[in-house]
């Protein structure tokens, strides 16, 4: 183990995936519900993970019709991107044998809500700025190599660089 990354588990998965590519696939199936009661946060659902589940709630800020009683859906999305990048950075460092004594990450961006407010067609997102700060005995060159590997291997970065197909379905219930 290196800085809370279990390298033996990664090694075992790599070996498994070399024999069975499907072993690298992890399916996600999330569910949530819009709450119509004025006394409740607007949206909620359970998020399952290997050792349990967590209830997540979202509420729009007041200017989008909520009360700001919970993080917005976008805040979760951005936290997910930041967490994915940071986790990938720590994992790539461990896989390369680069020890991290400490790592902090910041994500900064602006969101233009004019489109969501019906004021025209505007790109809502422009520039994700990830800033990773590491304390390590590694050289700056090694840290930059880990950054490069992270940029190449982080699923969140990949999703921002490549259009991901999607489908939407709306069904009226009786």
Where are these regions (language model features)?
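Extended beta-strand/beta-hairpin segments
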Residues: 1-79, 91-174
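Aromatic- and glycine-enriched beta-alpha-beta binding-site module
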Residues: 86, 90
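Alpha-helical metal-binding/catalytic segments enriched in His/Glu/Asp
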Residues: 81-85
